[in-house]
Amino acid sequence: MFSTSAKIVKPNGEKPDEFESGISQALLELEMNSDLKAQLRELNITAAKEIEVGAGRKAIIIFVPVPQLKSFQKIQVRLVRELEKKFSGKHVVFIAQRRILPKPTRKSRTKNKQKRPRSRTLTAVHDAILEDLVYPSEIVGRRIRVKLDGSRLIKVHLDKAQQNNVEHKVETFSGVYKKLTGKDVVFEFPEFQL
């Protein structure tokens, strides 16, 4: 029998906490006795968090390594369904573990000789988190509303075709995104007018 830490690989050799071990154990059980065995065997996670998303609801965020994100997304719909059964209806979302590098300033520019890649910028990482969050639905547009006090509200338009699948999770998505990035976001399913 594998240990519970088999499915979780933390950076710098840190030990997973109790909650992460629970998630890891759940993934192991799924791997043992479901038809997802072949796909799950190669995959692991880097971290897991449980957060409050308004009205006393909780959501589970599972962080996965960026190179494995595509493989997770192939089985994500079924994986999420199974995990939500196990964790009594808490919404589960998968997000890739990305790093944001600080903006080079005049002082820090000399230290790192390499240019900061676009994928490590704050904007790119926040956009990518949004894409991961709403998978399997797609973002078809966004509007940013700047209020008079300078605060921003991002309106994200999702694909109408997926409305039935993700509509009940929209509040969770907003809560998770606010927690991870500090940005307010509202999801909509607009009718398209040409």
UniProtKB/Swiss-Prot annotation:
Main location: cytoplasm
InterPro entries reported for this sequence: Ribosomal_eS7, Ribosomal_eS7_CS
Function: Component of the small ribosomal subunit. The ribosome is a large ribonucleoprotein complex responsible for the synthesis of proteins in the cell. Required for rRNA maturation.
Presence of the UniProt keyword Cytoplasm in the record: yes
Assembly and interaction partners: Component of the small ribosomal subunit.
Keyword Ribonucleoprotein in record: yes
Protein's organism: Xenopus laevis (African clawed frog)
Keywords: Cytoplasm, Cytoskeleton, Nucleus, Ribonucleoprotein, Ribosomal protein
Annotated compartments: Cytoplasm, Cytoskeleton, Microtubule organizing center, Centrosome; Cytoplasm; Nucleus
Name of this chain's protein: Small ribosomal subunit protein eS7
GO MF annotation terms: structural constituent of ribosome
GO cellular component, one term: centrosome
Superkingdom field: Eukaryota
Family indicated by similarity: Belongs to the eukaryotic ribosomal protein eS7 family.
GO biological process, one term: ribosomal small subunit biogenesis
